[in-house]
Design a protein with these regions (language model features):
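Polar/charged alpha-helical tracts
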Residues: 81-84, 98, 172, 181
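Extracellular beta-strand/beta-solenoid scaffold signature
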Residues: 1-5, 18-28, 41-57, 71-80, ...
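Aromatic-residue detector
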Residues: 76, 84, 114, 157-160
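All-beta strand scaffolds that present successive hydrophobic residues in beta-strands
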Residues: 10-14, 31-36, 60-67, 84-89, ...
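Extracellular/surface-exposed low-complexity segments
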Residues: 90, 118-127, 132-188
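Secondary-structure transition/turn motif
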Residues: 16, 38, 69, 91, ...
Length: 188
């Protein structure tokens, strides 16, 4: 796994990363481009700490995923604290460890995070929300996070905590497309 920090610029091509925590964390103004790769993480909140497989956080921090297969227990991709992620294609899924329900989102956009989804497939095993917009509790009402769903296929219509737990509204011109069947975790 790796951490991109303090304005670094990295292009990942055709790589495989299996991690027990973050596979990749992009922070502090970094620029990350993923051109084909497989990323997995076994981190979950049941062991006292958590990490999404790919995390983008901080003002001026940007991640572009042109294609990747990303799976994690806690979650696949998260963006927060002023970061921006653009997803053009790939498979983004979470899976449950032994029926404990400790998995969460294919994409989580939290705490002033910003995401644009142009394509890809999103799934969260055992949950009704594969994409999440906004924080929990009182923080949700003032969270300026945004997600633009312009393409892709989804296991469900997501969860918009900013607007009271409603489904996420797709961008103008995009019609929500549901996955024909669930994404099954593949052993690596």
């Amino acid at each position: 796994s790796g951490i991109l920090n303090n304005g670094g610029k990295v292009v990942l091509e055709d790589c495989t990363v299996n991690a027990a925590f973050y596979a990749v964390a992009n922070q502090g103004g970094g620029s990350l481009i993923v051109n084909n790769g497989k990323f997995s993480s076994t981190a979950h909140n049941g062991n006292g700490q958590w990490a999404y497989c790919i995390r983008t956080l901080g003002e001026g921090t940007e991640t572009v995923i042109n294609y990747a297969e990303v799976s994690g227990v806690q979650g696949a991709v998260t963006v927060d604290s002023g970061g921006k992620v653009t997803i053009n294609d790939g498979i983004f899924s979470t899976y449950d460890l032994s029926g404990t329900g400790n998995n969460f989102h294919g994409l989580a956009v939290l705490a002033d995070g910003h995401a644009v989804v142009n394509g890809g497939k999103f799934y969260s095993e055992g949950h009704d929300y594969c994409v999440r917009l906004g924080d929990d509790g009182a923080a949700a009402a003032s969270d300026p996070s945004t997600v633009e769903l312009k393409g892709g296929y989804f296991g469900d219509m997501g969860l918009d905590k900013i607007n009271g737990g409603t489904t996420i509204t797709p961008a103008a011109g995009y019609k929500f497309e549901q996955l024909a069947e669930p994404i099954v975790e593949q052993s690596t």
